[in-house]
């Protein structure tokens, strides 16, 4: 099917032709034949790199040309940013929405395409974004993640809510290959398009005894290292001019492999040296120093312990073919477009708490294998598993290469998932009686899949009972409605169980303590926590003794609850160190984490502190001011004494501390100093910016930003700028 013959807007056609795209891939042509450009719902379940983005683009531009508006839903913020850049180069207005979860973001409605995570879309629905009814097309990328225990329930509810709000809209689900696509397509009332076609031939095999066994042939691999099969496979690819991705089970393994690969590759490229220098800007941690040393020689590791900036540098260098090899945990396979000639799946067993080492699912193997082969760059792609012994070769073929993908299932019936979604349905006006609630849930993927809803109806009753007891929902006769507390909790996008614990504990306290508040938040379901090893317990116990007066929740008597308790305490200690202005490097060293971990924890608790301050403002006002100040301290990583200074735009933790140590403790004191004094402390650019806020020029028309504005100066050393 030729691009020239398609009913798509002429500007898009010319862009495709300019890029050398003259004919559709077979799966893309099948989508057009099934009604892609005629408003039909579609479920497209095809391999990675088979042209899903172009399928979505054609449909979106068709809608935009007809006056419509499109919503593109992704699972990850990083993928949202990637799609935002990609769609923005096609001559339409694109908006990106991944930020605060209590905002309506009405300005987004000015765009033709809005890109957002499923959590953000759920939040926009809860907060009543005015442009939602204008959406004529919803594209759900990675729709197979409806099976995810963490994110699946939210994605399922977003789809159900959008279909309820906009029954006439078109819906396109983009999926990896799954075992039960007909079931999912049936729920979506969608035409099903499946295919095994790929633009680059994928060869899947198992490595053992210096040979790769493919389905129909054997390929020898030169033995460079006697001890490391993964390294031999990697160097074999590089010798032929290709790049390599190596997937391993842990961060430690990823870093260890990158060091070995760097030692073998030994590149001396000036561009790589420049990448390494960029990584070392600021105050690098030991992890980042290791990464920079690897990058300088042509290899890298990639995992969630790195900051967004560091991951971005690695990804960019790999796309430019500067880096020859990346070793990664499976995070890299989840959505990011980073293909390579050969993908090595070294570790196909993963530790699972309570179950020991378990094989990864077929879907995860396929996600990783799908990264093999760069369209228009590689003649083929190879996905290679590594067998430890000869007997494993046929086993790995059977379990992964020849196996069917797993079915996807609804996760919405989990009681803990239902608490938040039942509350949002009631608070957002989707349901005003138990009957309407049941009727809405009867349209869920769960009920479609199981053909009955007895289990989910019982779970709904359990969730409602909790919400009524927690005073978030009231029931009068047959009517149910959200209370002021319930409405706020739904708007703030936190788990009702978190809100109940926070409000209850705050009401019990006579005296406020930052550490007590941080510890409380770290015990909630919304806050991920650090693993507490046995070796950590003495230090944690000492901290509890020393800071006992500031601890709100004492150790549990039940041994089964001890692990959860000490995880929360350890996380609270890390966050307390952050607000005590301990350097990022020392925090990473003390707690055995990476910059990305610290950033993630600060980002999470900062949102929960914001929600807590709003809960306190309405329901525990005696603590509101202190909690609001704690939120600012956490955002900037500062002690309270710096609060007056960081309210100025351009002043973060480093510059505020520098001013304070020079005897300048407030904006008032700062305004009394001469410009030349401030230049010595802050530098000329920031000094002028700060003075302009304190003494606005009459002829510039500039206004001082509102107190608490986010710092925009990239030189500030907070994790939010490193992020």
From Swiss-Prot:
Domain Helicase C-terminal: 230-416
Residue runs in coiled coils: none
GO biological process: DNA repair
Bias (Polar residues): 709-723
E.C. number: 5.6.2.4
Assigned keywords, A-Z: ATP-binding, DNA damage, DNA repair, DNA-binding, Helicase, Hydrolase, Isomerase, Nucleotide-binding
Catalytic activity annotation: Couples ATP hydrolysis with the unwinding of duplex DNA by translocating in the 3'-5' direction; ATP + H2O = ADP + phosphate + H(+)
Keyword DNA-binding listed: yes
Pfam short name (any one): HTH_61
Subunit structure: Monomer.
Family according to the record: Belongs to the helicase family. Hel308 subfamily.
Protein's name in the database: ATP-dependent DNA helicase Hel308
């Amino acid at each position: 099917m030729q691009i020239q013959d398609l009913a798509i807007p002429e500007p898009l056609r010319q862009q495709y032709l300019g890029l050398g795209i003259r004919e559709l891939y077979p799966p893309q042509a099948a989508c057009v034949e099934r009604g892609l450009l005629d408003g039909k719902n579609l479920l497209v379940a095809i391999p990675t790199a088979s042209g899903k983005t172009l399928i979505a683009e054609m449909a979106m531009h068709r809608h935009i040309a007809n006056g419509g508006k499109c919503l593109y839903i992704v699972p990850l913020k990083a993928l949202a940013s990637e799609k935002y850049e990609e769609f923005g180069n096609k001559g339409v207005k694109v908006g990106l929405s991944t930020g605060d979860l209590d905002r309506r973001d009405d300005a987004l409605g000015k765009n033709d395409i809005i890109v957002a995570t499923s959590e953000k879309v759920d939040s926009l629905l809860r907060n009543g974004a005015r442009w939602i009814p204008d959406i004529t097309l919803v594209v759900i990328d990675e729709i197979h993640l409806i099976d995810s225990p963490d994110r699946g329930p939210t994605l399922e509810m977003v789809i159900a809510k959008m279909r309820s709000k906009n029954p006439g809209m078109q819906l396109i689900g983009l999926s990896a290959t799954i075992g039960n696509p007909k079931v999912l397509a049936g729920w979506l009332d969608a035409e099903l398009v499946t295919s095994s076609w790929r633009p680059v031939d994928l060869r899947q095999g198992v490595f053992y005894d210096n040979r790769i066994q493919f389905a129909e042939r054997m390929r020898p691999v030169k033995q460079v290292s006697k001890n490391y099969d993964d390294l031999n496979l990697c160097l074999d690819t590089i010798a032929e001019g290709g790049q390599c991705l190596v997937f391993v089970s842990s961060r430690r393994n990823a870093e260890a492999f990158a060091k070995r690969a760097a030692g073998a590759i030994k590149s001396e490229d000036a561009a790589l040296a420049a990448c390494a220098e960029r990584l070392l800007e600021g105050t690098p941690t030991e992890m980042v120093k290791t990464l920079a040393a690897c990058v300088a020689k042509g290899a890298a590791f990639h995992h969630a312990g790195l900051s967004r900036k560091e991951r971005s540098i690695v990804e960019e260098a790999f796309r430019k073919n500067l880096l020859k090899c990346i070793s990664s945990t499976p995070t890299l396979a989840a959505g990011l477009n980073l293909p390579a000639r050969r993908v090595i799946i070294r570790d196909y067993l993963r530790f699972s708490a309570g179950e020991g080492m378990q094989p990864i699912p077929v879907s995860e193997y396929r996600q990783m294998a799908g990264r093999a082969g760069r369209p228009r760059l590689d003649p083929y792609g190879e996905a290679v598993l590594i067998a430890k012994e000869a007997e494993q070769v046929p086993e790995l073929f059977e379990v992964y290469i020849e196996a069917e993908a797993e079915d996807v299932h609804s996760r919405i019936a989990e009681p803990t998932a239902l608490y938040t979604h039942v509350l949002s349905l009631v608070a957002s006006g989707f349901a005003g009686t138990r009957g309407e609630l049941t009727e809405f849930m009867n349209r869920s993927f769960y009920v479609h899949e199981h053909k009955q809803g007895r289990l989910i109806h019982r779970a709904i009753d359990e969730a409602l009972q909790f919400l009524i007891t927690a005073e978030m929902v009231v029931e009068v006769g047959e009517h149910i409605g959200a209370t002021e507390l319930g409405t706020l909790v739904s708007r703030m996008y936190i788990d009702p169980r978190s809100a109940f614990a926070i409000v209850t504990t705050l009401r019990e306290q006579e005296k406020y303590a930052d550490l007590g508040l941080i510890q409380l938040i770290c015990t909630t379901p919304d806050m991920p926590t650090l693993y507490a090893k046995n070796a950590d317990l003495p230090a944690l116990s000492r901290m509890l003794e020393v800071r006992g007066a500031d601890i709100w929740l004492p150790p549990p008597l039940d041994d089964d609850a001890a692990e959860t308790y000490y995880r929360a305490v350890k996380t609270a200690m890390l966050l307390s160190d952050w607000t005590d202005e301990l350097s990022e490097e020392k925090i990473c060293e003390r707690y055995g984490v990476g910059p990305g971990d610290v950033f993630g924890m600060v980002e999470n608790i900062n949102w929960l502190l914001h929600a807590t301050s709003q809960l306190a403002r309405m329901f525990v006002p005696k603590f509101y001011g202190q909690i609001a100040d704690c939120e600012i301290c956490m955002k900037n990583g500062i002690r309270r004494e710096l609060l007056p200074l960081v309210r100025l735009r351009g002043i973060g933790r480093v510059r505020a501390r520098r001013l304070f140590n020079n005897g300048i403790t407030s904006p008032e004191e700062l305004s009394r100093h001469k410009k030349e004094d401030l230049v010595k402390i802050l530098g000329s650019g920031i000094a002028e910016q700060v003075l302009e806020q304190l003494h606005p020029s009459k002829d510039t028309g500039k206004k001082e930003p509102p107190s608490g504005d986010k710092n925009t100066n990239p030189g500030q050393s907070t994790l939010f700028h490193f992020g």
